[in-house]
Amino acid sequence: MSFEGARLSMRSRRNGTLGSTRTLYSSVSRSTDVSYSESDLVNFIQANFKKRECVFFTRDSKAMESICKCGYAQSQHIEGTQINQNEKWNYKKHTKEFPTDAFGDIQFETLGKKGKYLRLSCDTDSETLYELLTQHWHLKTPNLVISVTGGAKNFALKPRMRKIFSRLIYIAQSKGAWILTGGTHYGLMKYIGEVVRDNTISRNSEENIVAIGIAAWGMVSNRDTLIRNCDDEGHFSAQYIMDDFMRDPLYILDNNHTHLLLVDNGCHGHPTVEAKLRNQLEKYISERTSQDSNYGGKIPIVCFAQGGGRETLKAINTSVKSKIPCVVVEGSGQIADVIASLVEVEDVLTSSMVKEKLVRFLPRTVSRLPEEEIESWIKWLKEILESPHLLTVIKMEEAGDEVVSSAISYALYKAFSTNEQDKDNWNGQLKLLLEWNQLDLASDEIFTNDRRWESADLQEVMFTALIKDRPKFVRLFLENGLNLQKFLTNEVLTELFSTHFSTLVYRNLQIAKNSYNDALLTFVWKLVANFRRSFWKEDRSSREDLDVELHDASLTTRHPLQALFIWAILQNKKELSKVIWEQTKGCTLAALGASKLLKTLAKVKNDINAAGESEELANEYETRAVELFTECYSSDEDLAEQLLVYSCEAWGGSNCLELAVEATDQHFIAQPGVQNFLSKQWYGEISRDTKNWKIILCLFIIPLVGCGLVSFRKKPIDKHKKLLWYYVAFFTSPFVVFSWNVVFYIAFLLLFAYVLLMDFHSVPHTPELILYALVFVLFCDEVRQWYMNGVNYFTDLWNVMDTLGLFYFIAGIVFRLHSSNKSSLYSGRVIFCLDYIIFTLRLIHIFTVSRNLGPKIIMLQRMLIDVFFFLFLFAVWMVAFGVARQGILRQNEQRWRWIFRSVIYEPYLAMFGQVPSDVDSTTYDFSHCTFSGNESKPLCVELDEYNLPRFPEWITIPLVCIYMLSTNILLVNLLVAMFGYTVGIVQENNDQVWKFQRYFLVQEYCNRLNIPFPFVVFAYFYMVVKKCFKCCCKEKNTESSACCFRNEDNETLAWEGVMKENYLVKINTKANDNAEEMRHRFRQLDTKLNDLKGLLKEIANKIK
């Protein structure tokens, strides 16, 4: 039966008790902390590892020369060897153990490859050998052992088989596995070594692949070079020669294996000597208990077989008897195909049936075997097939990247689940499938209807699924009873944020926090730092970090789901974060918070690819927020609007609107539901149906407010105070406040212009004093905004203009009031005039309220940035031309003013068409210049001996032409193209851009005091006095945070949870519909192809 067929035919297991393992399975094994010196290694090897020498010479009657049955000549035996006649040779009787003399490092000549090797007796204890590998050769404890067998002779490797081997090596590298092979440079072992080499080079991994070759010492060619000299007591490096042209039956060692174990039984030229020791080592490792293993506390081992003959068959037989699962590659030929074909037989297996398969797949081999040997083969095959659960077959033609790993994991699972000791260890089985990411097996075989899982049973595997980024398993555990709220204890979160949190991410987060310094980034950084502070306490060099703690330590315990979501988001765990997001409360807020974090981190990441991934994930969460809010708004507008202003301390105390704006999520802000909410804020209690001209008219004729000209969204409760309520509702509307401010500002500009043009005297008159008072009110308002916004105040261009205008005005007052001389008075007036420009340009801000003019302001702002970069390019041409022109025409001009005019000013004017007239000698006018340089004229050009201009016209005129061509045509058109691109970008998102900018205007006037200018100054004085009083009395705010605990919040979040489920159902339905549509299209295409094929056949028949 094939791998897929066997997998589908497995029956569900009955319930059992969960075993427990102390630690989680890790793909990176732990190596011993004990370090050994070279002398300790030599002493250990010489004390525990032996070689075998034949001590009885038994002549081989079949040999032509005087050769012992051990394979060595008599001269090659040690001194004192006894001579026997016609006695059957046995290594236990006729050989003796001596301390090994071949071990150390092996250097393959001309290839530069190094590895370790050891000659050891075939009776070496497996425990001692394992100790050598792990503690003295410092190999990490394997998480998996893959024993590869088959095809010991040279053969042409098929491309499909090479791909399978490549995937096998990748699995070994990623899982921290050992690969065991025959270790020679022939057949399968040679190809395995080449794939190991290619993967090591291409992946450039710090974790080297461990490939252990176990070969027979007596079959190794050039083995004399491996023997140490008698005086070599320490480190020894053998220079091994790989002679591929040798024709003797001996093998050369493979240069791509990292470790070589050369098994010695005292004979020469006898193959398969190493099989016994290899089988014992595999069995020992498979039975060895490891704390890091997911295989019931044991190290998993699997036999991987392809092709092969007698020895491969024996190796598979031995593995099956040792309860080691085997993966057989069907299509690789020989014994592997025999086993694959017999696995699929459902009838009773008979000897004739087995022999038929042998003859079919190994005709030449079977024809040369005696009948007794064939019976042995049949017996071994029957023994193998008595344990079909230990056999997994994959087809070579269908073996893709995932098939090999799935086959290995499936083989391990079948062996584990059918083992008498482990078949009820559901926890161990689940860990195994989790490690290999086999979700389907876990769903079909473990999470069945006949077993009920407790939340505590799944907590350990849930933690593993989180750190290994297994989102599908996380979802599976949640669907089967895991309580995420109970699972996320403070200890679990501390482990996640400290041990399983990237240091690079933490540094980027700290950089972002310092660069942008907003509430969310500060909160998240403190959250992470709070979990990591135990590690910082060990670093005394950074004591300032010890003070980084959350003000409320219980915050993370109140919002563990949000903390876990932040952990996943910061590390770009895309699918995992989506699973966790579905479990959180306040999903809309969480999605916008994720978008904000990811976009901010993307700005500080040096890796372009990582930054792009963060941007992509941020856009996905913005889309989720948009779609979920649309779902909510279509169901209930009022509750959806409550979601917009719902804030949570887990997201820095920000609400949805604030996070969306900070993340520049224009798509979210442009949603109809959000815009309707902003419109309600903008008009306040005034009905949106009221025409704007009616509101403006009521500003000038106030009694009309109570005459019904303006309609309101609701009626006053107290009818006796109806008129008062109308006036209060009208004048507290942000739109009315805005309109009144516009009227006031226009009046202010008119007064400013009147003072500058008609009433500016040495002693200020009444209009000018009123102007000072109005500017003081504006100054108070800017101080209030700065106090409320803090550092973020200067991130707004309009605030920068306001500040600049006020400072200019103060400077103008200083000069203007210092009127002891006319020069100072004039300077003050000039400053006032320049300041008037700033105040007038500030009027542009009011146009953002217009749907048509608002985007145009954005275009102007972005085009100013284009002009800024354009000036850098233009400056290159301008300075190059200006300096060259001045140097050619004039000599030693000392006046900086005229140098500036000639080098900068005149070339700048040339861009607008004013051609320089001093580059043509025929039109040069000496009356407009000076030779002495002491007049208010430019310096005349240098003259020659004939009193004619010295400069060569064949240089100056072409120079002007080239400059005019470059600036007036190339650069100006480049600027026009830049403007066109900028306008196009804004125009594409015209509506979104305006709606996004509208938010700032609405919030600005919603946060203002609802008192008309300039009377608001009295409210400012009141606020200052109140603040001073609080500071003097040292009043403290004792209100505790009620975040997420108010009834209205709980009701809103519960309703949002229902809407979220509806939204997820729609997404999944849409995805299924798309998949079904694709399948339908493929079926239609297949039908058309079949019809076309039939038509072509008919045409071919007609032609014939």
From Swiss-Prot:
* Regions crossing the membrane: 734-758, 766-789, 797-817, 823-848, 854-890, 954-984
**Name of one Pfam family that matches:** Ion_trans
What cellular-component terms does GO give this entry?
external side of plasma membrane; membrane; membrane raft; plasma membrane; plasma membrane raft
* Tissue expression from the record: Expressed in dorsal root and trigeminal ganglia. Specifically expressed in a subset of sensory neurons, including cold-sensitive neurons in trigeminal neurons.
Give the membrane topology.
Multi-pass membrane protein
Q: Which stretches of this protein does UniProt put in the Extracellular compartment?
A: 759-765, 818-822, 891-895, 913-953
- What intramembrane ranges does the Swiss-Prot or TrEMBL entry report? 896-912
| Keywords carried by this UniProt record | Calcium, Cell membrane, Coiled coil, Ion channel, Ion transport, Membrane, Metal-binding, Sensory transduction, Transmembrane, Transmembrane helix, Transport
Q: Where does Ca(2+) bind?
A: 782, 785, 799, 802
Could you describe the subunit structure of this protein? Answer: Homotetramer. Interacts (via N-terminus and C-terminus domains) with TCAF1; the interaction stimulates TRPM8 channel activity. Interacts (via N-terminus and C-terminus domains) with TCAF2; the interaction inhibits TRPM8 channel activity.
> Which gene is transcribed and translated to give this protein?
Trpm8
Broad class of where this protein is predominantly found: membrane
The name this protein goes by in its record: Transient receptor potential cation channel subfamily M member 8
What GO biological process, any one, is recorded here? calcium ion transport
Q: What is the lineage of its organism?
A: Eukaryota, Metazoa, Chordata, Craniata, Vertebrata
Report which residue ranges the record marks as coiled coil. 1067-1104
The free-text domain note is:
The coiled coil region is required for multimerization.
Description of activity control:
Activated by cold temperatures and by both natural and synthetic cooling compounds such as menthol and icilin. Activation of the channel requires the presence of PI(4,5)P2; PI(4,5)P2 is necessary to gate the channel. Activated by intracellular Ca(2+).
Which segments sit on the Cytoplasmic face? 1-733, 790-796, 849-853, 985-1104
Reactions listed under catalytic activity: Ca(2+)(in) = Ca(2+)(out); Na(+)(in) = Na(+)(out); K(+)(in) = K(+)(out)
Q: Which family does it belong to?
A: Belongs to the transient receptor (TC 1.A.4) family. LTrpC subfamily. TRPM8 sub-subfamily.
